[in-house]
């Protein structure tokens, strides 16, 4: 019956349009979510080992610093100050106004030795003493694998301004060591 087959065709068209609408909404929501709420990052180097391994996949929360400032010890994703086309992952060591000193393999913040139980091995700074004063709205970043990290100590633009911090790393969802998708919080 032609009348019946036309009715079925209309039903299929409505169903397909319904699926297209659902898919379009899902794509828009996913885009907005990744653009404004979270960021996905894969760590390309060993600069944060053993906290984060080369190849680990991370989720950062973009809204983390909407109502408060980054804190010393936070692990963040940010625009590399010497080439903003690259994103880096490092630990915040110095916050605005801090005096950072590196001496005999140790980091001192405002004269106090920083407790760093996350370090892979002692830092080798060849006896060189370095001092940095962190400007307003800026941060001093170091990798946890200090002897293999391209960080604030070596950049032409030493500090990361707050507006270049993209997100606070919240958790790892893929662990390279176990080769498994697993959710673990990063501290």
State where each predicted segment sits:
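Short, conserved loop/turn and helix-capping segments at secondary-structure boundaries
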Residues: 49, 156-160
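Active-site environment of divalent metal-dependent phosphoester hydrolases
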Residues: 67, 148-149
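Phosphate/adenylate-binding glycine loop and adjacent helical scaffold
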Residues: 143
């Amino acid at each position: 019956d032609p009348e019946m087959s036309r009715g079925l065709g209309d039903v299929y068209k409505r169903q397909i349009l319904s699926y297209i609408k659902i898919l379009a909404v899902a794509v828009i929501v996913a885009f907005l979510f990744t653009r404004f709420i979270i960021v996905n990052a894969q760590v390309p180097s060993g600069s944060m080992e053993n906290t984060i391994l080369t190849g680990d996949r991370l989720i950062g929360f973009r809204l983390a610093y909407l109502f408060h400032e980054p804190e010393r010890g936070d692990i963040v994703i940010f625009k590399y100050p010497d080439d903003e086309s690259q994103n880096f992952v490092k630990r915040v060591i110095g916050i605005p106004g801090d005096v950072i000193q590196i001496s005999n393999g140790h980091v001192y913040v405002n004269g106090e030795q920083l407790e760093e139980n996350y370090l892979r091995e002692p830092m080798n700074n060849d006896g060189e003493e370095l001092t940095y004063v962190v400007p307003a709205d800026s941060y001093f970043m170091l990798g946890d694998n200090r002897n293999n990290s391209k960080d604030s100590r070596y950049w032409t633009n030493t500090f990361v301004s707050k507006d270049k911090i993209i997100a606070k790393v919240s958790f790892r969802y893929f662990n390279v060591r176990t080769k498994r998708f697993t959710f673990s919080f990063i501290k």
